[in-house]
Swiss-Prot record:
Family from the record: Belongs to the neurotoxin 25 family. ICK-8 subfamily.
Cysteine pairs bridged by disulfides in the record: 56-71, 64-77, 68-113, 70-84
Domain comment in the entry: The presence of a 'disulfide through disulfide knot' structurally defines this protein as a knottin.
Origin superkingdom: Eukaryota
GO cellular component terms listed in the entry, alphabetical order: extracellular region
Annotated protein name in UniProt: Toxin ICK-10
Alphabetized UniProt keyword annotations: Disulfide bond, Ion channel impairing toxin, Knottin, Secreted, Signal, Toxin
Protein backbone atom coordinates (compact mmCIF):
# COMPACT_ATOMS: atom_id res chain seq x y z
CA UNK A 1 0.00 0.00 0.00
CA UNK A 2 2.89 2.33 0.79
CA UNK A 3 4.29 1.77 -2.71
CA UNK A 4 0.95 2.79 -4.21
CA UNK A 5 0.98 6.07 -2.26
CA UNK A 6 4.56 6.71 -3.32
CA UNK A 7 3.68 6.03 -6.94
CA UNK A 8 0.72 8.43 -6.79
CA UNK A 9 2.88 11.17 -5.25
CA UNK A 10 5.63 10.69 -7.82
CA UNK A 11 3.12 10.71 -10.69
CA UNK A 12 1.52 13.91 -9.36
CA UNK A 13 4.88 15.66 -9.04
CA UNK A 14 5.92 14.54 -12.52
CA UNK A 15 2.65 15.81 -14.01
CA UNK A 16 3.07 19.16 -12.25
CA UNK A 17 6.64 19.51 -13.52
CA UNK A 18 5.59 18.64 -17.08
CA UNK A 19 2.68 21.12 -16.95
CA UNK A 20 5.01 23.91 -15.82
CA UNK A 21 7.48 23.30 -18.62
CA UNK A 22 4.65 22.90 -21.14
CA UNK A 23 3.40 26.35 -20.14
CA UNK A 24 6.90 27.81 -20.53
CA UNK A 25 7.20 26.34 -24.01
CA UNK A 26 3.75 27.63 -24.97
CA UNK A 27 4.69 31.07 -23.63
CA UNK A 28 7.89 31.04 -25.70
CA UNK A 29 5.98 30.14 -28.86
CA UNK A 30 3.41 32.85 -28.14
CA UNK A 31 6.14 35.41 -27.52
CA UNK A 32 7.63 34.58 -30.93
CA UNK A 33 4.30 35.25 -32.62
CA UNK A 34 3.82 38.48 -30.65
CA UNK A 35 7.32 39.56 -31.71
CA UNK A 36 6.38 38.92 -35.35
CA UNK A 37 3.18 40.94 -35.00
CA UNK A 38 5.05 43.83 -33.36
CA UNK A 39 7.72 43.87 -36.07
CA UNK A 40 5.08 43.78 -38.79
CA UNK A 41 3.08 46.58 -37.13
CA UNK A 42 6.21 48.76 -36.87
CA UNK A 43 6.91 48.25 -40.57
CA UNK A 44 3.28 48.89 -41.55
CA UNK A 45 3.03 52.13 -39.51
CA UNK A 46 6.20 53.65 -40.93
CA UNK A 47 6.08 55.93 -43.95
CA UNK A 48 9.03 54.28 -45.63
CA UNK A 49 8.63 51.16 -47.71
CA UNK A 50 8.63 48.17 -45.34
CA UNK A 51 11.54 45.79 -45.57
CA UNK A 52 10.77 42.83 -47.80
CA UNK A 53 11.20 39.60 -45.90
CA UNK A 54 11.90 36.51 -47.98
CA UNK A 55 10.51 33.24 -46.73
CA UNK A 56 13.27 30.75 -45.83
CA UNK A 57 16.11 33.18 -46.49
CA UNK A 58 18.10 32.47 -43.29
CA UNK A 59 19.64 29.20 -42.09
CA UNK A 60 19.91 28.09 -38.45
CA UNK A 61 22.35 30.33 -36.59
CA UNK A 62 22.00 33.35 -38.93
CA UNK A 63 20.64 36.75 -37.86
CA UNK A 64 16.91 37.26 -38.47
CA UNK A 65 14.00 39.62 -37.80
CA UNK A 66 10.94 37.39 -38.22
CA UNK A 67 10.20 33.69 -37.78
CA UNK A 68 9.26 33.22 -41.42
CA UNK A 69 12.80 34.11 -42.53
CA UNK A 70 14.18 30.98 -40.84
CA UNK A 71 14.26 27.78 -42.91
CA UNK A 72 12.50 24.83 -41.30
CA UNK A 73 8.95 24.21 -40.20
CA UNK A 74 9.81 24.54 -36.51
CA UNK A 75 12.67 27.07 -36.77
CA UNK A 76 12.05 30.38 -35.01
CA UNK A 77 13.84 33.69 -34.68
CA UNK A 78 15.06 33.69 -31.06
CA UNK A 79 13.79 36.65 -29.01
CA UNK A 80 17.03 37.83 -27.45
CA UNK A 81 19.82 37.14 -29.94
CA UNK A 82 17.65 37.33 -33.07
CA UNK A 83 19.17 34.23 -34.62
CA UNK A 84 17.36 31.31 -36.22
CA UNK A 85 17.10 28.33 -33.90
CA UNK A 86 15.13 25.11 -33.72
CA UNK A 87 15.90 23.52 -30.33
CA UNK A 88 13.47 24.33 -27.53
CA UNK A 89 14.59 22.13 -24.63
CA UNK A 90 17.28 19.61 -23.70
CA UNK A 91 14.53 17.11 -22.87
CA UNK A 92 13.67 15.24 -26.12
CA UNK A 93 9.94 14.98 -25.32
CA UNK A 94 9.62 18.67 -24.44
CA UNK A 95 11.76 19.60 -27.44
CA UNK A 96 9.45 17.63 -29.74
CA UNK A 97 6.37 19.29 -28.17
CA UNK A 98 7.95 22.77 -28.40
CA UNK A 99 8.92 22.28 -32.03
CA UNK A 100 5.31 21.30 -32.74
CA UNK A 101 4.11 24.55 -31.17
CA UNK A 102 6.72 26.48 -33.16
CA UNK A 103 5.54 24.84 -36.37
CA UNK A 104 1.92 25.82 -35.63
CA UNK A 105 2.99 29.39 -34.85
CA UNK A 106 5.05 29.57 -38.03
CA UNK A 107 2.11 28.34 -40.09
CA UNK A 108 0.04 31.22 -38.73
CA UNK A 109 2.70 33.92 -39.25
CA UNK A 110 3.84 32.95 -42.76
CA UNK A 111 1.89 35.73 -44.46
CA UNK A 112 4.49 38.31 -43.37
CA UNK A 113 7.03 37.02 -45.84
CA UNK A 114 7.05 36.85 -49.62
CA UNK A 115 7.78 33.55 -51.29
CA UNK A 116 10.94 33.41 -53.33
Amino acid sequence: MMKLYSLVIIATLAAAAFAATKQEIAAAALSGMVHDFEQYAKRAEGEEEPKRYIRCSKQLGEKCDLNCECCGASAVCEDYNYICKEKVSDNPVLDWFGQGLNAMGNAISRYYCDAE
